[in-house]
Amino acid sequence: MFQGSIVALITPFKEGEVDYEALGNLIEFHVDNGTDAILVCGTTGESPTLTFEEHEKVIEFAVKRAAGRIKVIAGTGGNATHEAVHLTAHAKEVGADGALVVVPYYNKPTQRGLYEHFKTVAQEVDIPIIIYNIPSRTCVEISVDTMFKLASECENIVASKESTPNMDRISEIVKRLGESFSVLSGDDSLTLPMMALGAKGVISVANNVMPREVKELIRAALEGDFRRAREIHYYLHDLFKVLFIETNPIPVKTACWMLGMCEKEFRLPLTEMSPENENKLREVLKKYNLPLKN
């Protein structure tokens, strides 16, 4: 079962290529700071602009660098089922601990199509699978009924990442799918309310910047200390907000550049932050006394 504090890791670039030195340093940073798992090649990892070869190489590199010290979850979804199967099979082959498979985007499948898609991936590849529900980007939402059917029939569908503000949906998933299924927040600002309803952790953007604090929030919530969890939530709330002042992952990668972790480099169609928003981000980071280097 996946739970705890999981980082949605950025993918650093340098001169147009994946910066593996910086990526290795980021992985070490999370090992040192007690993060429970890293997710590579997700939304925050700019997976849509990676080539197939880069995608596979990043996953393989992360698994080798982690060397069993921290779990590695690979983003392996796509809007073509055969591609999702291929990427998921590769993730298993190189030793990833699990796969995050996004709801197919753009082609807007029906619930039957979503069921067949995820069932095919789960049956073809025996690896723990997290369903990634993010309707703001996919334009379609997998229903709780469909998820319940999938989890009932496929033992390796073990969790969902929920990037939705719909708390009724979270309640329904927790109630119907039970303790053996992990609900993971996909939105830092909503992690605390989701965990109050029974979610078991977060796949976090803010974790790239302040992993120890996010880990403490999750620890407190899992132990039922919601007073402490609430204190940390409000302490981090300004960070949660500013990291989404522009499209993710633009602000968080810019924050990592300010902290000297990577270059400030994106691939089109993503571009650098506006100067105004970059200044807002810098002021928030200063508030937390973070060691700014750029």
Swiss-Prot record:
Protein keywords: Amino-acid biosynthesis, Cytoplasm, Diaminopimelate biosynthesis, Lyase, Lysine biosynthesis, Schiff base
Active site per UniProt: 132 (proton donor/acceptor), 161 (schiff-base intermediate with substrate)
Catalytic activity from the UniProt record: L-aspartate 4-semialdehyde + pyruvate = (2S,4S)-4-hydroxy-2,3,4,5-tetrahydrodipicolinate + H2O + H(+)
Pathway: Amino-acid biosynthesis; L-lysine biosynthesis via DAP pathway; (S)-tetrahydrodipicolinate from L-aspartate: step 3/4
Record site: Part of a proton relay during catalysis: 43, 106
Superkingdom of this protein's organism: Bacteria
UniProt record, GO biological process: diaminopimelate biosynthetic process; lysine biosynthetic process via diaminopimelate
Annotated TM spans: none
Binding site for pyruvate: 44, 203
PROSITE patterns with a match to the protein in the record: DHDPS_1 (PS00665), DHDPS_2 (PS00666)
Entry EC no(s): 4.3.3.7
Places the protein is found: Cytoplasm
NCBIfam families: dapA (TIGR00674)
Record's function text: Catalyzes the condensation of (S)-aspartate-beta-semialdehyde [(S)-ASA] and pyruvate to 4-hydroxy-tetrahydrodipicolinate (HTPA).
Designated name of the protein: 4-hydroxy-tetrahydrodipicolinate synthase
Gene name as annotated: dapA
